[in-house]
């Protein structure tokens, strides 16, 4: 199995590869959508990118990329010696420097270990990828532990909701405990109209509460549904919406380019105080 994974890659330099886990703790915040759009945007900037769908048995990243009919082999077959890693890495036809690796097929479950993930990522690094983005399973159980094991950096995705913020705070602590200190925040599904009515926390409020450097903010967009059904990330639309522009902006910031953050309005300090009280357990009369 080790020989299958490392075939033809032993002498290549992998020191320049950045391995980033995209995580959230809470499901339904747009983590997989974020992975697809950041990955595609980074590839369009000229970098070689590998995306790993680490959600065992519940993969969706292939659907968002329009690659579901091309997934013949997965990491499971690689580990079992049925194929080599290069056969399981599916190259995107639109941007050949973007590849997808699924851990398992939809109805399969594989007992993945931390060692499996580390070996897998090490082998991808040997193929001279500039970026490896790992789409982490929702939750903080063994799937989370395995997905973050090979990562050196993390992007925490949250929404401006108290439950999502609290989960993001817990995930940030777990990442630090795992030795991942390069963590950035992406606030998704922002509603400027609700912020103006003081019904939603602003992006700045969320960032200040979590104390994590802000990578970007993505507005709520009904085009996400259309994008998912078409298997085409928002950033590939001919006419970019604000959410598509925001994803591209975040991708440029992630690769180190100096880009201004997309401003999605300001918030209300009274609402911020109420949520802070809730998160700290002192929500009397809230």
UniProtKB/Swiss-Prot annotation:
Pfam families: CbiA (PF01656). ATP binds at residues 26-33. Its main location: plastid. Keywords: ATP-binding, Cell cycle, Cell division, Chloroplast, Nucleotide-binding, Plastid, Septation. Transmembrane segments: none annotated. GO terms for molecular function: ATP binding; ATP hydrolysis activity. GO terms for cellular component: chloroplast; cytoplasmic side of plasma membrane; cytosol. The keyword Plastid applies. One of its GO terms (biological process) is negative regulation of cell division. It is found in: Plastid, Chloroplast. NCBIfam families: minD_bact (TIGR01968). PANTHER family: SEPTUM SITE-DETERMINING PROTEIN MIND HOMOLOG, CHLOROPLASTIC, SEPTUM SITE-DETERMINING PROTEIN MIND HOMOLOG, CHLOROPLASTIC-RELATED. Belongs to the ParA family. MinD subfamily. ATPase required for the correct placement of the division site. This is Putative septum site-determining protein MinD.
């Amino acid at each position: 199995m080790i020989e299958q994974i490392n075939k033809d890659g032993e002498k290549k330099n992998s020191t320049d590869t950045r391995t980033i886990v995209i995580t959230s703790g809470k499901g339904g915040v747009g983590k997989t959508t974020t992975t697809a759009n950041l990955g595609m945007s980074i590839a369009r900037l000229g970098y070689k990118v590998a995306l790993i769908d680490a959600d065992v048995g519940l993969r969706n990243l292939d659907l968002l990329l329009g690659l579901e009919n091309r997934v013949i082999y997965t990491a499971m077959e690689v580990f079992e010696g049925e194929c080599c890693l290069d056969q399981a890495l599916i190259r995107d036809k639109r941007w050949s420097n973007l590849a997808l690796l699924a851990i398992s097929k939809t109805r399969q479950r594989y007992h993945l270990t931390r060692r499996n993930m580390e070996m897998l990522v090490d082998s991808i690094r040997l193929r001279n990828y500039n970026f490896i983005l790992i789409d982490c399973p929702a939750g903080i159980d063994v799937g989370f532990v395995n997905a973050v094991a090979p990562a050196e950096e993390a992007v925490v995705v949250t929404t401006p909701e108290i439950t999502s913020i609290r989960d993001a705070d817990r995930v940030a602590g777990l990442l630090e405990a795992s030795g991942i200190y390069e963590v950035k925040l992406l606030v998704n599904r922002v509603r400027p109209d609700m912020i103006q009515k003081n019904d939603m926390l602003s992006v700045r409020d969320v960032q200040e509460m979590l104390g994590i450097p802000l990578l970007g903010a993505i507005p709520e967009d009904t085009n996400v549904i259309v994008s998912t059904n078409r298997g085409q990330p928002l950033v590939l639309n001919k006419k970019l919406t604000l959410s598509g522009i925001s994803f591209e902006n975040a991708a440029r910031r992630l690769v180190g380019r100096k880009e201004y953050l997309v401003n999605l309005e300001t918030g209300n300090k009274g609402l911020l105080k109420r949520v802070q009280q809730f998160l700290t357990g002192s929500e009397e009369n809230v």
